[in-house]
């Protein structure tokens, strides 16, 4: 699957700082120690039944900064992101709107790519859809069946499930108690009340063919995969048995990341599947999490269509720590616009305060579990000092600009991004 155009990245001088990140599984901040061959990161992507909202954008910006800090440290980064282009929400939206689910998925995936390019997100080396990966996914289900880590429900449906007893460490990523697991499982795509399962928490691996639903061939019979096995299969195929970071929003801690890790570990016996499980906080609006079910979404494409500079969107999302749930407000938006204007003014001067000191402070803050608010403050202080006209480092504006663009991903020369000619229907969310 096609990704998007990469932003320009400059190699910075000076001393990079190794990255430390909070690991959900170990519940503490630890150094990331990528393999000498390169860092490996898998981030769960969109289910393309609607446009990119600010919650998606915040997550993608988070892992983009990780990518940038690793690159600053000289690591080659193998970054893989999936597209869940076969799933119930996609089918339901397509049926509601009287549209082919394939066409809907392709259109919204194209819009997502445009949004990511506008936000200066470094594209993944492999941008992979579930549909194109179906043979790989089916093969992993078959592998789990052969290993005794799956069972078929005895009701003639052909549905195959993964038992929570298949791995000894189930629950070690989320640390949730059983009641919490059951609640989230039911709320986030699971089927705890499904009859015939050995345990209410057992997760679907393969859904047997149903009339009116898409299906694919496998040794287990025609059908389609469950959600969690898709990510496990794609990650294993493109990154190997163990990865450095498995990431997404904090609503994926359970069941999605718990089960995708368990699927991978049951198949490969490589434990843990990821050295770091990293989760971004939710973006809220009017005191509630931003979500499609609540209808309170702010779309990146709508902001762009209204003339909002993508750099302002990115700065606003960087203003809070990535692990915190935080609101999107008019005040946040306005503050980001003001900040960007000050930065651009300061970086347009012929000289300024010490750029070397500021660049190092930005590196130090980002390497400390992505302290983006601290990094922004470092640039704020440099801009304020430079705008007084009392400092005369002629190299500073260019150095700080390169630091901001390379590490924070904030574009300081405004760019014009293309809009799709078909965007009118996509951007009209009033229906």
From Swiss-Prot:
Membrane spanning stretches: none
Q: What is its EC number?
A: 6.3.1.13
Known cofactor(s) = Zn(2+)
Any Gene Ontology biological process: mycothiol biosynthetic process
Q: What are the protein's UniProt keywords?
A: ATP-binding, Ligase, Metal-binding, Nucleotide-binding, Zinc
Q: Which GO terms describe its cellular component?
A: cytosol
Q: Which cysteines are joined by disulfide bonds?
A: none
Reactions catalysed, as given in the entry:
1D-myo-inositol 2-amino-2-deoxy-alpha-D-glucopyranoside + L-cysteine + ATP = 1D-myo-inositol 2-(L-cysteinylamino)-2-deoxy-alpha-D-glucopyranoside + AMP + diphosphate + H(+)
Lineage, top-rank taxon, reads Bacteria
Pfam families in the cross-refs:
tRNA-synt_1e
Gene Ontology molecular function, alphabetical: ATP binding; cysteine-glucosaminylinositol ligase activity; cysteine-tRNA ligase activity; zinc ion binding
Q: Where is this motif: 'HIGH' region?
A: 46-56
Sequence motif: 'ERGGDP' region, positions:
187-192
- Is the Nucleotide-binding keyword given for this protein? yes
Which amino acid positions bind Zn(2+), per UniProt? 44, 231, 256
HAMAP family on file: MshC
**Per its database record, what is this protein's job?**
Catalyzes the ATP-dependent condensation of GlcN-Ins and L-cysteine to form L-Cys-GlcN-Ins.
Q: Under what name is this protein listed?
A: L-cysteine:1D-myo-inositol 2-amino-2-deoxy-alpha-D-glucopyranoside ligase
Q: Which organism is it from?
A: Stackebrandtia nassauensis (strain DSM 44728 / CIP 108903 / NRRL B-16338 / NBRC 102104 / LLR-40K-21)
The taxonomic lineage of its organism, from the top, reads: Bacteria, Bacillati, Actinomycetota, Actinomycetes, Glycomycetales
């Amino acid at each position: 699957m096609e990704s998007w155009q990469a932003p320009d990245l400059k190699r910075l001088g000076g001393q990079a700082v190794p990255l430390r990140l909070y690991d959900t599984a170990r519940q503490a901040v630890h150094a990331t120690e990528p393999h000498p061959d390169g860092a490996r990161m898998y981030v769960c992507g969109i289910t393309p039944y609607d446009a990119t909202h600010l919650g998606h954008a915040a997550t993608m910006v988070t892992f983009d900064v990780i990518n940038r800090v690793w690159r600053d440290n000289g690591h080659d980064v193998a970054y893989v992101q999936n597209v869940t282009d076969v799933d119930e929400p996609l089918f339901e939206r397509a049926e509601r709107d009287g549209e082919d689910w394939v066409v809907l998925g392709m259109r919204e995936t194209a819009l997502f790519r445009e949004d990511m390019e506008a936000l200066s997100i470094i594209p993944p080396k492999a941008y992979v859809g579930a549909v194109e990966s179906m043979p790989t996914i089916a093969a992993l289900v078959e592998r789990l069946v052969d290993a005794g880590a799956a069972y078929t429900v005895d009701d003639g449906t052909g549905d195959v499930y993964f038992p929570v007893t298949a791995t000894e460490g189930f629950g070690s990523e989320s640390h949730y108690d059983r009641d919490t697991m059951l609640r989230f499982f039911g709320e986030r795509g699971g089927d705890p009340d499904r009859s015939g399962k050995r345990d209410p928490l057992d997760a679907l691996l393969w859904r047997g063919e149903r009339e009116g639903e898409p299906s694919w061939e496998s040794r287990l019979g025609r059908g389609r995969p469950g959600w969690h096995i898709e990510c496990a299969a794609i990650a294993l195929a493109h990154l190997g048995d163990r990865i450095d970071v498995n990431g997404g929003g904090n609503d994926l801690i359970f069941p999605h990341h718990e089960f995708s890790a368990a699927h991978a570990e049951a198949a490969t016996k490589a434990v843990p599947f990821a050295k770091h499980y990293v989760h971004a906080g939710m973006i809220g609006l009017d005191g509630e999490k931003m979500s499609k079910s609540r209808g309170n979404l702010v779309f990146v494409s709508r902001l762009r269509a209204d003339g909002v500079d993508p750099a302002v969107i990115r700065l606003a999302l960087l203003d809070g720590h990535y692990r915190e749930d935080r609101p999107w407000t008019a005040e946040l938006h306005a503050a980001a616009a003001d900040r960007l204007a000050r930065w651009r003014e300061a970086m347009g001067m012929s000289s300024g305060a010490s750029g070397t000191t500021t660049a190092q402070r930005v590196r130090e803050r980002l390497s400390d579990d992505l302290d983006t608010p601290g990094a922004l403050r470092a640039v704020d202080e440099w801009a304020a000092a430079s705008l007084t006209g009392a400092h005369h480092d002629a190299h500073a504006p260019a150095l700080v600009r390169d630091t901001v663009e390379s590490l924070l991903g904030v574009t300081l020369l405004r760019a014009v991004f293309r809009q799709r000619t078909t965007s009118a229907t996509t951007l009209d969310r009033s229906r």
